[in-house]
Curated annotation (Swiss-Prot):
GO molecular function: ATP binding; protein serine kinase activity; protein serine/threonine kinase activity
Keywords in alphabetical order: ATP-binding, Cell membrane, Glycoprotein, Kinase, Leucine-rich repeat, Membrane, Nucleotide-binding, Phosphoprotein, Receptor, Repeat, Serine/threonine-protein kinase, Signal, Transferase, Transmembrane, Transmembrane helix
Source species: Arabidopsis thaliana
Protein name according to UniProt: Probable LRR receptor-like protein kinase At1g51890
Membrane topology note: Single-pass type I membrane protein
């Protein structure tokens, strides 16, 4: 299938259609002049307007007149970009809304060079696709489904070689947020088919969302159609023509087969199949079939299309194929009297968008600064100010923290011919550390809001002769306490300020040099001491028989005697908890609260776990791993001393045992993100990598600020650093959270932790126990999948939340969790991917709490019961 190639034919002149509502449509005829006009394209009845208000660069042009009669009017003009490497369209939209975005590129020898262009297309800071024009009269269409992360969107054309980027039309169509849901990334269209041997191609207004449908019917199938109306009112709103036609096998006793292939065998796909029974079956007649994938994997069992009503079946988690081939077989069951059918098929490829946008407020501020000071002609000031780093705006420095948006940390507009007052928009750059506005023609007062910019340490306003020299009182206080340096011109009695500041900076620099020298000397001595005697673990003699096969722990750091443990716990006065390892007590050490875990006098395995935990915690440090304060290895007395986590474990907080306050959805997402970051650090930040092996809510502890930290590393195992992805080990863990593949094979990998974490995510969403024999499906994984067959997310969400959450965000978490608990470890995501997804879910909730204008439809789609296989589709 070459769907995008077929799309070019759609832009040929079609028959007239009737008008429908185009609310929310953005239809741009790129390069249209005069820019103020709009027109209605006759063959589609879509209203187009110029792109001029969405972009401030580029040159209008028109395709050669000889080609114009072959295409719809919005293709005749175009905009090319001979200047600058990146040129971007800017849209102000609503965050979290879902859009179909389509760019069309018809060369038509507009420049008379007969030179076929190639360039890249970006969505925000991420590459969307490479555009290569196949012929003078041909072109390219790029289409994707994308959820906005912020309330602005940039679509950029990036020059990659000697040819000039251009664009013919750009179209945005709002979609229902409950449709085309992914665990991550956006969707690029591979094919959108309805089953007919002949045209027409379908788009608006037959498709209210202006999706483009291509007719398709191969010689192994025949056409089934009806003149009766079909109910298409589920979330996907397929056109009537799609619903009223279907493909069935030529031989009614044979299965229906649909095959396609993708060039990129690593790509992930989502498949949407639309079904409706369009024959009037008698009472003793049945159409029932199974859907299998690539030779036997069950996709859907005993499926019966509803009578004259569309139902959509899709995979809740992306699928891939080892060789890039996708083969679907629709086979009659033994109960069926009629062959299988299918009415419509949509195939999408996942486009991951790993690069986060710069903070929204900072982007808005920079756009305002660009407009206020007339900086639109700066060729690099296009698109996202910081991302990707290769295209960062000239004059900016940015920081790029892990799993967080880029931040603008310095702005240099020195000598930029700025005039007028200093805009207060600069104060919205909350991460800004240095601001240079020197050598311009700025006037007016120094904004008092600069004093509220807590990260700002340097302001250079020198060379602005018309700027008011008075300094706001609040800003002067920061200058006086040395938290901010202000460089400005002075006259008269204050003329020495710049010199004084320069001298002060020089003095500080000299002190820093001296301190650096002292630090190097001290550090050198420390290394000499370390070289003379290691302060880690060494082999020694063990007194207890229970430890006869293990080394003792000998270190000079963090080691306490048993009497010191008695003192810090006041003779074990207050019990915090009990477990198989022993008892945890409250303690105080140097006026700091601690938790003391005393190991019971038991087996050699207990000591091994104790030793493993000490060894791990002495060498790993992360803000989301419980910190080890020290340990006791005194005769038969073994203890671990941890930082005290005031709010106890996650299970206690979810159940209400620790507090009557219900954990909000935002807090739950924050806890999930932080626990995932701790786990991701064990997998990727440690050398050698570590597997926790016992991830569960009771091992996720919360401090007084509800910050989450992973605890209990007694079962943790390390991996060799030679590329091994798994090790064979005796199965250990907690029933209900144990990876079934690990249990079956004894092969342990990081994906075993991913499985356990997926179970924890389901508990966070549902507040249900992992095992409950009174449920129809005892294990929480099976119960969630069973409950979601009706597409109603509310049926599983913790009722204590009182529906105070973003439904789309909950769906994303549940689908991520179900991907984590996939029985096959190879199909589970990695922890970095989990962290990225959860960060997006947290951002959705934070934006909702801050008053986002986005609205979502919460109804669910009716859906036939599915089997509980790996690929059971979810409905919504």
């Amino acid at each position: 299938m070459r769907f995008l190639s077929f799309l070019i034919f759609v832009f040929a002149v079609l028959g007239l259609v009737q008008a429908q509502d185009q609310s929310g449509f953005i239809s741009l005829d790129c390069g249209l002049v005069p820019t103020e006009i709009t027109y209605v394209e006759k063959s589609t009845n879509i209203t187009y307007r110029s792109d001029a208000t969405y972009i401030d660069s580029g040159v209008p042009g028109k395709i050669n007149e000889v080609y114009r009669t072959q295409f719809q009017q919005q293709i005749w003009a175009l905009r090319s970009f001979p200047e600058g490497q990146r040129n971007c369209y800017n849209f102000s939209l609503t965050a979290k809304r879902k859009y179909l975005i389509r760019g069309t590129f018809i060369y038509g020898n507009y420049d008379g060079l007969n030179q076929l262009p190639s360039f890249d297309l970006y969505i925000g800071p991420n590459k969307w696709t490479s555009v290569s024009i196949p012929g003078v009269r041909n072109g390219s269409v790029s289409e994707m489904i994308h959820v906005l992360r912020q309330d602005h969107l940039q679509i950029c054309l990036v020059k990659t070689g000697e040819t000039t980027p251009f664009i013919s039309s750009l179209e945005l169509r709002p979609l229902n947020n409950n449709t085309y849901v992914t665990k991550s990334g956006s969707l690029i269209v591979v094919a959108r088919l309805y089953f007919s041997p002949t045209p027409p191609f379908l788009r608006y207004d037959e498709d209210v969302h202006d999706r483009i449908w291509i007719p398709f019917l191969d010689n192994k199938n025949s056409l089934l159609s009806t003149e009766l109306s079909v109910d298409t009112s589920n979330f996907y709103n397929v056109p009537q023509t799609v619903a009223k036609t279907a493909a069935v096998p030529l031989n009614a006793t044979q299965p229906l087969k649909i095959n396609w292939s993708l060039d990129d065998i690593t790509s992930q796909s989502y498949i949407y199949m639309h079904f409706a029974e369009i024959e009037n079956l008698e009472a003793n007649e049945t159409r029932e079939f199974n859907i299998t994938y690539n030779g036997g994997e069950n996709w859907f069992s005993y499926f019966r299309p509803p009578k004259f009503r569309i139902t959509t079946v899709y995979n809740p988690a992306a699928v891939s194929s080892l060789d890039g081939n996708f083969n679907f077989t629709f086979s009659m069951t033994g109960n069926s009297t009629h062959p299988p059918l299918i009415n419509g098929l949509e195939i999408y490829q996942v486009l991951e968008l790993p690069q986060l946008d710069t903070y929204q407020d900072e982007v808005s501020a920079m756009m305002n600064i660009k407009t206020i000071y007339g900086l639109s002609k700066r060729s690099s000031w296009q698109g996202d100010p910081c991302a990707p780093e290769l295209y960062r705006w000239e004059g900016l420095n940015c920081s790029y923290p892990n799993f967080a948006p880029p931040q603008i940390i310095s702005l240099n507009l020195s000598g930029s011919n700025l005039s007028g007052t200093i805009t207060s928009d600069i104060s919205k750059l909350t991460h800004l550390r240095e601001l240079d506005l020197s050598n311009n023609d700025l006037s007016g007062d120094i904004p008092f809001v600069f004093s509220d910019m807590k990260n700002l340490t340097l302001i250079n306003l020198s060379g602005n002769k018309n700027l008011n020299r008075s300094v706001p009182e609040t800003l002067q206080k920061r200058i006086d306490n040395k938290s901010l340096t202000l460089i400005r011109d002075e006259t008269g009695k204050n003329s020495t300020n710049v010199v004084a500041i320069a001298a002060s900076v020089a003095s500080v620099f000299a002190v820093l040099v001296i301190l650096a020298i002292v630090f190097v000397v001290i550090r050198k001595k420390q290394r000499t001491n370390e070289a003379s005697g290691p302060r880690s673990f060494t082999t020694g003699t063990v007194k207890s028989d229970a430890r006869s096969s293990s080394s003792s722990i000998i270190t000079k750091e963090r080691k306490f005697t048993y009497s010191e443990v008695l003192k810090m716990t006041k003779n074990f006065e207050r019990v915090l908890g009990k477990g198989g390892f022993g008892t945890v007590y409250h303690g105080n050490l140097d006026d700091t609260q601690v938790a003391v875990k005393m190991l019971s006098h038991s087996s050699a395995q207990g000591y091994k776990e104790f030793k493993a935990e000490v060894e791990l915690l002495l060498r790993v440090h992360h803000r989301h791993l419980v910190g080890l304060v020290g340990y006791c290895d005194d005769g038969d007395n073994l203890a671990l001393i941890y930082e005290y986590m005031e709010k106890g474990d996650l299970r206690e907080n979810m159940s209400g045992k620790h507090s009557v306050n219900v954990l909000s959805w935002e807090t739950r997402m924050q806890i999930a993100v932080e626990a995932a970051q701790g786990l991701e650090y064990l997998h990727n930040g440690c050398r050698p990598p570590m597997v926790h092996r016992d991830v569960k809510p009771t091992n996720i502890l919360l401090n007084e600020r509800s910050q989450a930290k992973l605890a209990d590393f007694g079962l943790s195992r390390s991996f060799p650093v030679d590329g091994e992805s798994h090790v064979m080990t005796v199965v250990a863990g907690t029933p209900g959270y144990l990876d079934p593949e690990y249990y079956r094979t004894n092969w342990l990998s990081e994906k075993s932790d991913v499985y356990s974490f997926g179970v924890v995510l389901l508990e966070i969403v549902t507040n249900q126990p992992v095992m409950n024999k009174n449920r129809e499906r005892p294990h929480i994984n099976e119960w969630v999948m069973f409950m979601l067959t009706n597409g109603d997310i509310k049926s599983i969400v913790d009722p204590k939340l009182n529906e105070d959450y973003d439904t789309n965000g909950v769906w994303k978490v549940v689908e991520l969790a179900l991907a984590c608990v996939n029985p096959s470890s190879s199909r589970r995501p990695t922890m970095p991917h989990v962290v990225m997804e959860l960060n997006e879910c947290l951002a959705l909730e934070i934006e909702r709490k801050q008053g986002s204008q986005a609205t979502y439809i919460k109804e669910s789609v009716e859906f036939s019961p599915s089997s509980a296989s790996d690929f059971s589709p979810l409905a919504r």
